[in-house]
């Protein structure tokens, strides 16, 4: 007789290729028999999304940086994730993506200007379309201190339509 294990399972395969100025990678992840990352799940499928028995996620990542810094050409990071959820009453899917840009040594050695934006995975209906971004400038006034002012914002955060946020932060790092 065959027995089906009631234990949760998580199987994944990663593959990547990296060179000094670029990298690409992919991952496939299959979770089944009740393994749960519930806050990443897509909206209800004629029932409770918590009842999802299995899902398959695929993630793609890549980055590239120029041969030299200070040229005005940014390094670039990109990513895309897609997840298909199988539930007793149907199927659903969710996508997420991001793009990051980073300029190094534009004004002074060791400074960085960065921008990132993207759409995180949502567990809500299609009326909710979250979007997030951040902008920052990191600089070193001396060899022991790095200062990084940044602003960030997001729309439809935490799966709530109109749940928008905006903020600023000023990080200071001391090295002794």
Where are these regions (language model features)?
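Residues that define the transmembrane beta-barrel architecture of outer-membrane proteins
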Residues: 7-9, 54-58, 91-97, 129-133, ...
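Repeated loop/turn-to-beta-strand initiation elements of outer-membrane beta-barrel proteins
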Residues: 13, 17-26, 32-35, 60, ...
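Residues on the lipid-exposed face of transmembrane beta-strands in outer-membrane beta-barrel proteins
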Residues: 13-19, 60-64, 80, 99-103, ...
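Predominantly the C-terminal beta-signal and adjacent terminal strand-loop region
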Residues: 131-176
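Short, small-residue-biased leader/transition segments that mark boundaries at the very start
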Residues: 1-12
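Transmembrane beta-barrel strands of outer-membrane/channel proteins
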Residues: 26-30, 76-82, 99, 113-119, ...
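C-terminal hydrophobic structural anchor segments
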Residues: 102-145
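Gram-negative outer-membrane beta-barrel proteins
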Residues: 32-38, 68, 82-88, 107-109, ...
